[in-house]
Structures are given as C-alpha cells and as structure tokens.
Amino acid sequence: MALDILIVDDEEDIRELISGILSDEGYQTRTASDSDSAFREIEARRPSLLVLDIWLQGSKKDGLEILRIVKSRHKDLPVIMISGHGNIETAVAAIKYGA
C-alpha cells in the first residue's frame, strides 16, 4: 500500500504541484487549504506524512500552531514544514514543536 501524504498549503498551485510530483512517484496524496480542513483530514484518516506550510493565509491557525496540536495528538506522525518566507526563528520553532 502506498504511503498516504497530506499536503496543507493555502496556495492551490503549490498543493497541486507537490501532490502531482508525489503522485507520480507512487504516493497517495490528499490536500487541505487551511487548519480546519487539515484537522478534518487527519482525524478522518491519519496520514503517513504531513507536508505543512508555515504561513496559511486565511486560516484560523498557522502551520506552527497546527504542528503543535498535531504533535500533541500524534507524536509519531512525521511532519515536513515548507515555506516561501521562512526565517531562522520560525525554523527553530518548527524543530522545537517536532517537525
């Protein structure tokens, strides 16, 4: 069975790009555009990997807050954080939260 990867990003083009690349490599992918849809997807079926954008415009929670909550519920769920606008402080926070 292929690994199930959940991709969370507010930009549809980025979600589709990452999903397409991973699907071409044989992975099963799902996408979410904000915190609410991400939590719904995770609770409906826990993914094998979470690819999570740090800045989610229009979302109730940003990627770091989603990471913190997800790791409190699913400690062993691997998470890869992505961002087009990262900085050292944000990267350190993501590592501290378990990414």
Regions found by a protein language model. Give the residues of each.
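Active-site beta3 strand of CheY-like receiver
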Residues: R45-L56, I80
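Short amphipathic alpha-helix used as the core "switch/output" element in two-component signaling
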Residues: R40, D62-D76, A93
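Conserved phosphotransfer microenvironments
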Residues: S35, D53-L67
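His-Asp phosphorelay/catalytic-motif detector in bacterial-type signaling
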Residues: A2, R46-S48, S72-P78
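The feature encodes the CheY-like receiver
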Residues: R15, Q57-S59, S83, N87
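Conserved active-site segment of CheY-like receiver
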Residues: D10, M81-G86, K96-A99
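Acidic, metal-coordinating helix/loop segments flanking the phosphotransfer/catalytic sites
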Residues: L6, T31-L49
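Two-component/phosphorelay signaling modules centered on CheY-like receiver
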Residues: L3, E11-R30
